[in-house]
Amino acid sequence: GGVGKSALTIQLIQNHFVDEYDPTIEDSYRQQVVIDGETCLLDILDTAGQEEYSAMRDQYMRTGEGFLLVFAVNNAKSFEDISAYREQIKRVKDAEEVPMVLVGNKCDLPTRAVDMSQAREVARQYGIPFVETSAKTRMGVDDGFYTLVREIKKDKMKKGNSSRRGRSGRKQLKCSIL
């Protein structure tokens, strides 16, 4: 908890930074965006980082199509926890490859506990993109979410599935933030 998952989501949806920390249980957001010339409806599930809500994790991992694995650059433990989240997602989805993006948040802070070259190396080992973000300055926020959408689309093309299309013909994509 406290890595800035909600702040990233609110920055994407409402274009402002939430300073106070109010632990999330679960919040859901919808946002229509145009990515690579295509209109997509993002279904974003902002999840609980607190350990006491870990029982809910399997459920939202089952329904999510792609995942932002968020750690705070000033919190080494949050980075170390990423591996367990990734393994849990793969287990729940019963798949070796699931669309994910590693996100290093709070990049505006001068003090870092996580070396970005280390984060890039972990992302490379996992075969997933890495994006540096700051919910405070909005740096990389769109990039993080849009990169995940591209990963979901790539995965669907590989599997030969076309996205579910809503009544309006927009693609609907379910993203979860861990």
UniProtKB/Swiss-Prot annotation:
The Gene Ontology biological process annotation of the record reads:
signal transduction
InterPro entries associated with the record:
P-loop_NTPase, Small_GTP-bd, Small_GTPase, Small_GTPase_Ras-type
For the motif Effector region, what are the positions?
21-29
- Topology relative to the membrane, per the entry? Lipid-anchor
Q: What is its main location?
A: membrane
Q: Which GO MF terms are attached to this record? A: G protein activity; GTP binding
The known regulators of its activity are described as: Alternates between an inactive form bound to GDP and an active form bound to GTP. Activated by a guanine nucleotide-exchange factor (GEF) and inactivated by a GTPase-activating protein (GAP).
**One GO cellular component term:** plasma membrane
Alphabetized, the UniProt keywords read: Cell membrane, GTP-binding, Hydrolase, Lipoprotein, Membrane, Methylation, Nucleotide-binding, Prenylation
What is the name attached to this protein's record? Ras-like protein
Write down the species.
Artemia salina (Brine shrimp)
The UniProt function text for this chain reads: Ras proteins bind GDP/GTP and possess intrinsic GTPase activity.
Transmembrane regions: none
> Does the record bear Cytoplasm in its keywords?
no
Q: What is its EC number?
A: 3.6.5.2
Propeptide residues, chain positions: 176-178
Using the UniProt record, name the top-level EC class of this enzyme in a single word: hydrolase
Family per similarity comment: Belongs to the small GTPase superfamily. Ras family.
Residues with Cysteine methyl ester modification: C175
Instruction: Detail which positions bind GTP.
Output: 1-6, 46-50, 105-108
The record lists the catalysed reaction(s) as: GTP + H2O = GDP + phosphate + H(+)
Q: Where in the cell is it found?
A: Cell membrane
Q: Source taxonomy lineage?
A: Eukaryota, Metazoa, Ecdysozoa, Arthropoda, Crustacea
